[in-house]
Every structure is written in C-alpha cells, then in structure tokens.
C-alpha cells in the first residue's frame, strides 16, 4: 500500500487519513465551469462497519485548506465496507482550478513515496 504524504490527504473520519488509493474520474462540461470528480475506494481503511453511519463527508486536505463534499455512497457486505464512491463537484473555473491544485498535490504525494 502506498504511503501518503501527511500534508495532503483524503479523510472520511476527521483526523484519520484514508490510506486506500482511489480511482478518480474527472467529468467537465464544455462550458468549462461545471464538472465533477468521482472517487472510488475499493478497500477503504478508515470506514468500518462500526463507524460507517457517522461518515457524512469526504475531506480533501492540502496546504491551501480543505475541500469537502457530502456526496458519499457506500457498498456494504455482511462483514466489511466493500466500496466507497464519493463525488466532488464544482461550478466555476476558479473552483475547478482549486480542485486541480489539490489533485496535483495529492498525485505528487503518492509518487514521492
């Protein structure tokens, strides 16, 4: 499992960095303003059967601050959380650029470890 830089993180539980590396897909409208990033975690480490009901946000944390979304879908089996799908949306060029700075920092933190 890839170690993630502590300065850049994704969290579902405040204070606990998610260690599972997500699959990320970007979608952007032709107008350049609206879009979304869909994150899929296939082996989440911070969401368990005991705490999944309290998970209400995904936090994207970097040196500029915190981005967050409430759009989270969980797939649960009898004995574990199978998959987490979370969608971060934006509706302006500035918000897209801010998201891309986070995404770049997150990707760079993975490649350094």
Swiss-Prot record:
Gene3D superfamilies: Photosystem II Psb28. The keyword Kinase does not apply. It is a peripheral membrane protein. It is found in: Cellular thylakoid membrane. GO terms for biological process: photosynthesis. One of its GO terms (cellular component) is photosystem II oxygen evolving complex. Pfam families: Psb28. Keywords: Membrane, Photosynthesis, Photosystem II, Thylakoid. Part of the photosystem II complex. NCBIfam families: PS_II_psb28 (TIGR03047). Belongs to the Psb28 family. This is Photosystem II reaction center Psb28 protein. The gene is psb28.
């Amino acid at each position: 499992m890839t170690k993630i830089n502590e300065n850049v993180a994704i969290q579902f539980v405040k204070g606990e960095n998610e260690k599972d590396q997500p699959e990320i897909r970007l979608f952007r409208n032709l107008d350049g303003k609206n879009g979304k990033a869909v994150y899929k975690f296939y082996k989440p480490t911070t969401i368990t059967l005991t705490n999944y009901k309290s998970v209400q946000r995904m936090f994207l944390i970097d040196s500029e601050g915190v981005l967050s979304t409430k759009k989270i879908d969980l797939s649960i089996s009898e004995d574990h959380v199978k998959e987490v799908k979370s969608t971060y949306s934006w509706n302006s060029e500035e918000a897209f650029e801010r998201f891309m700075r986070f995404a770049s920092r997150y990707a760079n933190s993975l490649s350094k470890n």
